[in-house]
Every structure is written in structure tokens, then in C-alpha cells.
């Protein structure tokens, strides 16, 4: 199999990439700080660097443990012949599964087809049948009223609702009113239906700001599912699936992690289809091997760039973790190049963030930002330390490599647009540092406006669009420039979840202004009261993201799907602590599942 081995570490002459499109104005100060957490293995370093004023500046930081993954995947061997053999088996099974999916006819058969689509999604096979799924849902949505008439099965109604919303069809939540009794509450007869209650819970996680009945459903299903899983009323494999869903709903979980769990669950179902089961295992195994190939390419590139010898140890060593988090954006086999590019793009984001936030003196930071704004070194850069010159050169060279890769297919526009957004990012980060040093405590609303409006959410989505190449039209970049509502909701979600996990460490580093402290001071509430309110705000942001995904017009579904992926990335990152800075624990478990653990074929 061929792996995209692009963008070698060629740090030669710099070129200037000028955009003929002035799409991105410099926004107000925006900040999506990656907070630092105490670590048992952290070491405190103090370095002295010569500033452009010929004054020494003390740089203190905590050295985080290096990633345990980089060396592992750099030395791993992938059996290409095994991939070829698996591909042959997949190609043989795919038409057989397609025949099953497309053989259903009529209204009831459309229901069965949608139920099978849900199974394909859960098994990680939906990407194999995108065209068939699209046609099925397009046809079925036109018959939705007829299809749902007289349907009293909670599982069926919930799955149909979930699948349509998954693919951007705004199906009404009023269909669930049939499951309420005369007292206005959900019928008690539903409680013992574990399969139906779980699907209803999953549907409730697709709620928009106007789906009030789904708010009731989420509370109703969550409490009863916990009891079902705990009291032994369900088979062990169903109890485990319920617990996994309560920890992370399918809507807010990574597709291939869901697939691993569902394959294990499905195998224990008495009525499982052996061919589907085998197909799903082969598909996961093939993708896993492809991911390992990509990681080998990335770790080779990372070692050749040689950050360790060229930078003080202030930066987060996370190239493999980058690839993991990118699974929220690109999971399909055909997006190998996009994953590799995006992992490198994340290195750019992290290096600039750690340099400005954790290490550089203010004069150094100003010189770096000024040079990046001009896309050429300023006079002060000549006097800066070697580490800063390396950071500047690395950023320009990497964007140059992106441009060289995408230019032949007409993707230069996306690179230029992303460069402009990157400039806005570093400017905003610099201004935020100045603001923090001024020891100013803003209002909560000002803090959210200044630090939340679209910086990492915006820059991440822009980079993902760039990595997709020419298939993303120019109009979508113009749409993103307008800071649409979905981006604002993602930014608020990320800002609040970030500060909820890291505000104590922010304060220990001298940053008094964060969402928690601003809210506590302004509204005179306790820490726990503030955190409880933030949880409510994050829930509203999630509903807004869901709503905008279903209702936004004038932009491709591809970009809206990428925006949903950014929201998922935020959820995964901050599900427990700050998973990017400290990927130990749950993130490590998930990475092991995706990259290391084997599914027996």
C-alpha cells in the first residue's frame, strides 16, 4: 500500500506566500489557551535569553514528560502484504453487504434499511457506503411522515431520528410525544426496554436549542439507564454498552472508538450477521494498519526536524497525539494525506502557542509576531535567540511545503487563507499575553468575548479545510471569515471547558483572569456554583452546534461536518482534565485501543 510521505524537513530558503484575497481581518483579542497542569514528572527550568533590547529575560516553564509514543511508532514495521490481503477480502465482501442494504423495498423496508445504516455507522462501515446511504435518506426523508405513522417501537423511532440528524436532515423531535402518557411524562412501560432506552438517550444527545422534549428525554433515560446497567437487569454486554454510552454518547465520541466497542457488543448478540461482523473487523484492521503507516511517516519527519536539539524543552511533544485527535476530523481511508498534513499543522499551532505562552519574553514574542505578520523577519529578529529564529523559520517552511503539495491541484487559495488566519492567531495570543501581564480583571462577558471568539476553533477548522485541498470551494472560506454562529458556539464550548479544567494552574502561573475567577467575582458565587453554570453553558453550546449543523445554508456539508469534528475534538480533549497537555489516563487508553490493541479476525 502507498502512504503519502510528503513534506520532508527541508529548511532551506524562505518564500513569501502572498494572498490576493484579503479575507481575514485581524479580530479582537481572542484566546483559547492550552492550560498546563502539574505533573509528578515535571521539571522546572529557568533559561536566560538575550532580548532585542540586549537585556536578559528569565524564562521559567515546567518541562512536561515527552511522549512515549514517538519512538514506538518510528520503529514499528507495517506488513504491506497483510494490508493487500485485507483489501482483497474487503473488496469481496463490500458488494455482498451492499446487496443486503439495497434489497429492501417499500415503507417498512425503508425503516429496515435505516436500521441497517445505523448498524453500519456503529460498526465503522458507513464510509464504505456513503452514496447508498445518501440516496436512502434522501428518498426516506420525503416519506418521513408516512414512515413514522403508527410506529410505536421506541428503538425504531429513536434510530430513525438519530440517523437522519446524523446526516443533516432536520427531523422533528415531536415524533417522541407518542411515548408520553396522559400525565405528560414518559410512559413507565419504556423503562424496562434497555435497547429502546439506550437509543432514546442517543437521540436526546442530538438535541437543538428548541428540542425541549429531548431535554426531558436525556434526564429520563440517563437515570434509568444507570439503574438498568447496575442492577443486573441486562446481559453483561448490554450493561457495558450502556455504561460506555453514559460516559460518552455516540454523537460525541470518535467513530472508530465507537466501532471497536460496537464490534465487541455485536459479536455477543445472538442474531448477529457473521458477514457484517467479519467485514467490520477487516475494515478496522485495515484502517489501523494505515494509521500506523501514517504515524511512521510523521514520526520520521518529526525526528528529522529535530525539535529536541533546536528548542529548549518548553514545548509539548505530541506528534502521535496529534494524529489521534485528528481522527475526529478525518477517519476515512482516502484522507491519509489530510491526516498527515493536519498533524503537522497542529505542530505549528502548538509550537507558536507554547513559545508565546510558556517561554518567550515579551520582546521576543513581539519580534516573532511582527515577523510572522510580514511573513519575513524583522530587524529585531536578527538579534533574537536561535530558538526563536528556528520557530519562525519552521513555521514559514512548513506552510511552504503545504503550498507546494496543494498548488498542482489548485489548493493554494486554502493555504493563503490559512496563513492569514494563522497571523490573526499569533497576534491575538500576543495581545492576550500583554493583557494578562497587565493584571486586569475583566467582566465575564468581556473575557468570553476577548478570549473565546473563534480562535482555536476557527484556526483548526481553517486548517482542516486547507488539508482537504481543492474540494473545499473558495466560498466556504468566505463563509468561515464571517465567524458564523457554529464557530462562536464551538469557541465558547472550548473556552469554558478549557478553563474549567485548568484555571487553578493558570492562577498558579500568574494569570488571574480566567472564566472561573471572572464569573465568581462578577456574580459573587462559589467555585462550584460557577462550574455548574459553565456545564449548563457548554450544554447550550452543544445544542447550538447541533442546530447550526442542521440549518446552516450556503456552505458545503463537508465543512459543516468538519465543524462538528472540531466540537468532538473539544469534547474528547477535555472529557477528563486537559487531554492534550496531559494525555495520560483516558487519552492513553483510547490511543492504545485505536493504534495498538488488535481485533482478532
Curated annotation (Swiss-Prot):
The keyword Hydrolase is annotated on this UniProt entry: no
Signal peptide limits: none
Keyword set, alphabetical order: Cytoplasm, Lyase, Magnesium, Manganese, Metal-binding
List of residues binding Mg(2+) 1: 353, 357
Residues annotated to bind Mg(2+) 2: 353, 357
Motif annotated as DDXXD motif, chain positions: 353-357
Gene Ontology biological-process annotations: diterpenoid biosynthetic process
CDD domains reported for this sequence: Terpene_cyclase_plant_C1 (cd00684)
Entry superkingdom: Eukaryota
UniProt pathway: Secondary metabolite biosynthesis; terpenoid biosynthesis
Annotated cofactor note: Binds 3 Mg(2+) or Mn(2+) ions per subunit.
Primary location recorded for the protein, binned into one broad class: cytoplasm
Binding locations of Mg(2+) 3: 498, 506
Record-linked SUPFAM superfamilies: Terpenoid cyclases/Protein prenyltransferases (SSF48239), Terpenoid synthases (SSF48576)
This protein's domain notes: The Asp-Asp-Xaa-Xaa-Asp/Glu (DDXXD/E) motif is important for the catalytic activity, presumably through binding to Mg(2+).
Family: Belongs to the terpene synthase family. Tpsa subfamily.
Name of the molecule in the record: Terpenoid synthase 15
Organism of origin: Arabidopsis thaliana
